[in-house]
Amino acid sequence: MMLKPEGLKLIDENGRRLDGRKKYELRPIKMKVGVLKNANGSAYIEWGKNKIIAAVYGPREIHPKHLQRPDRAILRVRYNMAPFSVEERKKPGPDRRSIEISKVIRGALEPALILEMFPRTAIDVFIEVLQADAGTRVAGITAASLALADAGIPMRDLVAACSAGKIEGEIVLDLNKEEDNYGEADVPVAIMPIKNDITLLQMDGYLTKEEFIEAVKLAIKGAKAVYQKQREALKEKYLKIAQEVEGSEQ
């Protein structure tokens, strides 16, 4: 959160935000599954101006062997922002923020996976941010969950994520870059919608108890809308496969 430039209004008198959205409106979201041929599973997401690709490899052998778990697979997540993903070109390779977000995403995804089915193996998730525009962790979680499903990893549920926040004293859904920079708070949430479980809940900034509850409820509502888009993306891929199979049989 940064000091807001004088005269900048994040919401106008008609309740419209800088990008024209209403308070409770998501940015445009597009998802595609199975975008990388060499990965076991993959997904691509455009969320506002965010462009993120996720790839899953595994279950596969772990080296060195002392990292193996005899009772379950281990989930390894690497979140990385490409040097060209932000306006000020960043140094290549993982920084402290990327390492922290990798851990956060792993914690959000792990409850959904049935890791006990693959003892002594690893499931590797790579998330590459090609273009960043606020909310990369929730978009990354959403894409990674799709890629895991695409890889055929047994899951209790998909994980869908969204954030809410506070700008100009108002609770709003899905902050964009300016709102994230100059707003008062950001609350990213990840859920397993069918099980109704929260797998990630964070807060950056300050909210009263009432505002926090309102923001969490709004983020959950947003995540449920994201979940429907995840389902559509998976259906689209497998309907296409079914059509190809039918076509080859004729």
From Swiss-Prot:
Q: What class of enzyme is it?
A: hydrolase
Please give the Gene Ontology molecular function terms for this protein.
3'-5'-RNA exonuclease activity; RNA binding
Enzyme Commission code(s) on record: 3.1.13.-
Q: Does the keyword Nuclease apply?
A: yes
**One cellular component GO annotation, for this chain's record?**
cytoplasmic exosome (RNase complex)
Q: What Pfam families does UniProt report for this protein, alphabetically?
A: RNase_PH, RNase_PH_C
List localization entries: Cytoplasm
Principal location class: cytoplasm
Instruction: Please give the InterPro entries that the UniProt record associates with this protein.
Output: ExoRNase_PH_dom1, ExoRNase_PH_dom2, ExoRNase_PH_dom2_sf, PNPase/RNase_PH_dom_sf, Ribosomal_Su5_D2-typ_SF, RNase_PH, Rrp41
- UniProt similarity note: Belongs to the RNase PH family. Rrp41 subfamily.
Q: What function is annotated for this protein? A: Catalytic component of the exosome, which is a complex involved in RNA degradation. Has 3'->5' exoribonuclease activity. Can also synthesize heteromeric RNA-tails.
Q: Which HAMAP family match?
A: Exosome_Rrp41 (MF_00591)
Self-association and partners: Component of the archaeal exosome complex. Forms a hexameric ring-like arrangement composed of 3 Rrp41-Rrp42 heterodimers. The hexameric ring associates with a trimer of Rrp4 and/or Csl4 subunits.
Which named protein is this?
Exosome complex component Rrp41
Q: What is the lineage of its organism?
A: Archaea, Methanobacteriati, Methanobacteriota, Thermococci, Thermococcales
